[in-house]
Curated annotation (Swiss-Prot):
Primary location class: secreted
Protein name per Swiss-Prot or TrEMBL: Glycoprotein hormone beta-5
Subcellular location field: Secreted
Alphabetical list of Pfam families matching this protein: Cys_knot (PF00007)
Length: 130
């Protein structure tokens, strides 16, 4: 459970932070862009017992086309929902500053190498809907 949290937590953080960068951008091109791309952003890496460390990394961001159409047979809908997600990543480990005695100072996070629009995979992305 802890291993999954260490991996999925940073992945979700990268996706959310990347999404925030897109929403905050003032460029008209970013507002109309449809697709999935690698984009640089900065986040604060932290864990209990250590000071935070600002990290600049690459993450996936974008907007992918989705659609649904009614059909006559169950389940009565044909859905095509794709998300901007990681296709290829590498893991980077950094040492957090000023950790308390007994606290592991190392923090590992994914760096996006390639991103694509695709089906949501719980191995790399938090796939819950609202």
């Amino acid at each position: 459970m802890k291993l999954a949290f260490l991996f999925l937590g940073p992945m979700a953080l990268l996706l959310l932070a990347g999404y925030g960068c897109v929403l905050g951008a003032s460029s008209g091109n970013l507002r109309t862009f449809v697709g999935c791309a690698v984009r640089e952003f900065t986040f604060l890496a932290k864990k209990p017992g250590c000071r935070g460390l600002r990290i600049t990394t690459d993450a996936c961001w974008g907007r992918c086309e989705t659609w649904e159409k009614p059909i006559l047979e169950p389940p009565y809908i044909e859905a095509h929902h794709r998300v901007c997600t990681y296709n290829e990543t590498k893991q980077v480990t950094v040492k957090l500053p000023n950790c308390a005695p007994g606290v592991d100072p190392f923090y590992t996070y994914p760096v996006a190498i390639r991103c694509d629009c695709g089906a949501c995979s719980t191995a790399t992305t938090e796939c819950e809907t609202i």
